[in-house]
Design a protein with these regions (language model features):
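Transmembrane helix-loop-helix hairpins at the membrane interface
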Residues: 85, 94-206
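Membrane-embedded alpha-helical segments in integral membrane proteins
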Residues: 34-49, 113-121
């Protein structure tokens, strides 16, 4: 899961919206992460591809954090300007983030950020040619992963674009650490911001 910044909307009356519990969300994140890592492992084991390396370089770590903050800022701009995305993001994040406690945001960053980047950038990019076509294909797959329903297509569009940005960063640095760090940063910061806005709005109503 890739969570992009939004402000909670109290007018979420989607007919298909079913509130999830904290346990359900955490289990879903954990199982999804295990599944994606298993797919990556099997692909590397039986496919003729090599994993994009993870190099622990301070410079690349900082690039990843900066990229994650940039994606978060860009997401807030898209949220403000594109009504369809705003409604889609509100639906998606209300379903995923609302049940979580603050400490859970660590898992929100780490589990999707590491497992999704391992597969979509670490394995798919080298497997499909390590070029622009590979970025496009892996980004489309990444976007589809975030499809909760056809009505939420704007969220998928933005996730695809962000996946492309992460893919470019991987090719530019030849280091999987960059998109991993960016993804974890985006998820964690977006989750914290969403929780803060939810708390602020609840206090204003009192």
């Amino acid at each position: 899961m890739s969570s992009f910044i939004s402000v909670p909307d109290s007018n979420l009356n989607e007919p298909e919206f079913t509130p999830l519990t904290r346990t359900q969300v955490l289990i879903a994140m954990g199982l999804t992460a295990v599944f994606l890592m298993l797919v990556s492992k099997l692909w590397l084991q039986f496919g003729s591809t090599l994993l994009l390396p993870v190099q622990w370089l301070t410079q690349d770590l900082l690039i990843g954090v900066g990229l994650g903050l940039g994606v978060t800022l860009a997401s807030s701009g898209v949220y403000a300007l594109w009504g369809a995305y705003r409604r889609s993001a509100d639906y998606y994040l209300e379903m995923v983030l609302k049940p979580l406690a603050l400490p859970d945001l660590i898992w929100l960053g780490l589990l999707p950020g590491l497992s999704e980047e391992l597969l979509f950038r670490g394995v798919m990019l080298p497997a499909f040619g390590y070029d622009a076509t590979a970025i496009l294909f892996s980004s489309l797959c990444f976007g589809v992963l975030h499809l909760s329903s056809l009505r939420q297509w704007p969220y998928v569009v933005w996730a695809t674009i962000v996946g492309g940005v992460f893919g470019v960063s991987a090719l530019a640095t030849h280091n999987l650490l960059v998109p991993m760090t960016a993804h974890v940063t985006t998820n964690f910061v977006s989750g914290c911001f969403w929780k803060w806005e939810e708390y602020r709005k609840s206090t204003l109503k009192e």
